[in-house]
Amino acid sequence: MPVVINYHSNHEAAQAVKQEIEDAGGMAELLPFDAADPSAIDAAIDQWEENHPDDHVAVLVNNAGIRRDNVMFMMGDDEWHQVLDTTLNGFFYITRRLLKHMMPRRRGGRIVNIASLSGVKGMPGQANYSAAKAALIGATKALAQEVAGRQVTVNAVAPGFIETDMTRDLPQDELSKLVPMGRFGTPDEVAALVAFLASDQASYITGEVININGGLYT
């Protein structure tokens, strides 16, 4: 299955992911746009569909997100809106656009939303991020019921502390002590769960939020 990789500004990192997929024997292409800009999304997908008249997106992974951490009484309007625009509104814009073609085909489809432990339990200093991810979880459950009759499944994955660019500035040694397994998770571990939810084996699973956090629930 060819992979379409969206990115906003980091072309070098996106190209590295593309190369990794191709080195493993897969096919991939880049599709740059700002997930918070509905006009940019429509233009990019219109162009992609024009270039691929016989193809359609069967699996959508909503993974766009940013952090602008701050305690609420010091949080600026831009810190609040930037996080919700990318993390929550981006999910809405992209999913709405692709559902227009995913649903009428009646071939089924997979939507996997990357939520977060922050959206499950809330994290201090992340009221904006926690709100966006909690809303994403609610939207996952609602949308799953809306599209189930078209054989489209919608699920969410809620990672805890994972070794990514978004957690690079966090004190990993200290935070690992909070995790019963004693370590951060890896992107490969999250990817394996996403791959399962996107597979035929998960065709009867929908509306679920699956935590992957090393036992960190409270």
Model-predicted segments: where are they?
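The beta1-alpha1 cofactor-binding region of Rossmann-like NAD(H)/NADP(H)-dependent oxidoreductases
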Residues: 11, 32-45, 77, 188-189
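Residue(s) in the substrate-gating loop at a strand-loop-helix junction
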Residues: 116
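Substrate-binding pocket helix/loop in short-chain dehydrogenase/reductase
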Residues: 57, 71-72, 79-84, 167, ...
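C-terminal substrate-recognition "lid" of short-chain dehydrogenase/reductases
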Residues: 186-212, 216-217
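Active-site loop immediately N-terminal to the catalytic Tyr-X3-Lys motif
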Residues: 73, 121-127, 149-150, 182, ...
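Alpha-helical segment proximal to the catalytic Tyr-Lys
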Residues: 100, 145-149, 203
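Active-site helix of classical SDR
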Residues: 95, 132, 140
